[in-house]
Amino acid sequence: MIIEPRMRGFICLTSHPKGCEQNIKNQIEYIKSKGLIDGAKKVLIIGASTGFGLSSRITSAFGSDAATIGVFFEKPPLEGRPGSPGWYNSAAFENEAHKAGLYAKSINGDAFSNEVKKQTLDLIKSDLGQVDLVIYSLASPVRLHPVTGVLHRSVLKPIGHSYSNKTVDFHTGIVSEITIEPCNDEDIVNTVAVMGGEDWGMWMDELKKANLLAPGATTVAYSYIGPSLTEAVYRKGTIGRAKDHLEATAFAITDSLTSIQGKAYVSVNKALVTQASSAIPVIPLYISLLYKIMKEEGVHEGCIEQIQRLFQEKLYTGEAIPTDEKGRIRIDDLEMRADIQEKVAQLWSQATTETLPEIGDLAGYKQDFLNLFGFEFEGVDYNADTNEVVNIESIA
């Protein structure tokens, strides 16, 4: 079939298998161009099909020749209906990894569930014995709690008072004022249940109990802080409470891993275009201004550049891992540079529908958004008839 982008609000309903494959190849080429990383050799990635999790899988495999197991929850394609981008990404990744002689297997299912945890543990036990790195990178809006059976839904709201600021519809370029009403207490509880650290802790407990963590194993989860400009809706809102919980969980996990000298870290990453960030009011406008400035300064990074730097310059230098005063790894250091944030704040006050094409990088934002779904890649013939039914080798 001919596959074109079909939009509904902040979601693209279609994805392109050949474009997703090109995305994987581009990321692999980047990692190879940066040389070898003396990293982990057996890696579990929970949330492995898109964004930072996918880039972590690619960096481990093609930077350190690691065997990888990826867990994700994606929609397989049917005849006449494309699958989700994460499905195509994972199919392409496995294909490339196997061609390179690397071990790569995937599990498609709800990572919050006991069943998927058990399936993953069994696979590690039979194929790898133990893992020395666990990446936790889930980005789900809902979680069915495996113990209570409660379905929790996260919300993105300010706490205590309503919040008004500018936002942009990145499809039309229209800048408008938006007001977000404050959350209630239940919203906070639900958001922490979905996006906090409880499930990360459960995974690590199960892995340790089953003796599947190698001595000195490391686990890393991803977080975001951002500037004062976005803090009411992000770091000081419901999602910020979840991130606080995630960060506190790192210390609890480290305590639980003392017998194997294991360590848990949260890495604070930069703002990037993702399916999740596109749905958060205010953030797309911030990102389009940030991109413009970081590109002008020559310090812009996408997912793969961020994760390559995390692995090469922070996690695997042979030295102690550098952290901030709260024990977090900071690869948002370039985004948060005072001069860059100052320029963003200046542009923010000037941003209107009329000025944004000039002062922001809306074109870059749109391109990155379409890239998430396999569109707008050079070297892909989007007019060609494409087979939408693609299998993942280890799942088929």
Regions found by a protein language model. Name each.
Residues 47-54, 112-114, 139-143, 225-229:
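Gly/Ser/Thr-rich loops at beta-strand to alpha-helix junctions
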Residues 119-148:
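A glycine-rich helix->loop->beta "capping" turn
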Residues 65-105, 110:
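Glycine-rich phosphate-binding loop and adjoining beta1-alpha1-beta2 segment
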Residues 2-25, 98-99, 229-396:
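NAD(P)H-dependent oxidoreductase Rossmann-fold/reductase module
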Residues 46, 131-139, 151, 218-223:
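Rossmann-fold scaffold of SDR-type NAD(P)-dependent oxidoreductases
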Residues 108-120:
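The beta1-alpha1 cofactor-binding region of Rossmann-like NAD(H)/NADP(H)-dependent oxidoreductases
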Residues 153-262, 268-291:
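Catalytic loop of short-chain dehydrogenase/reductase
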Residues 35-73, 77:
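Canonical Rossmann dinucleotide-binding motif of NAD(H)/NADP(H)-dependent dehydrogenases/reductases
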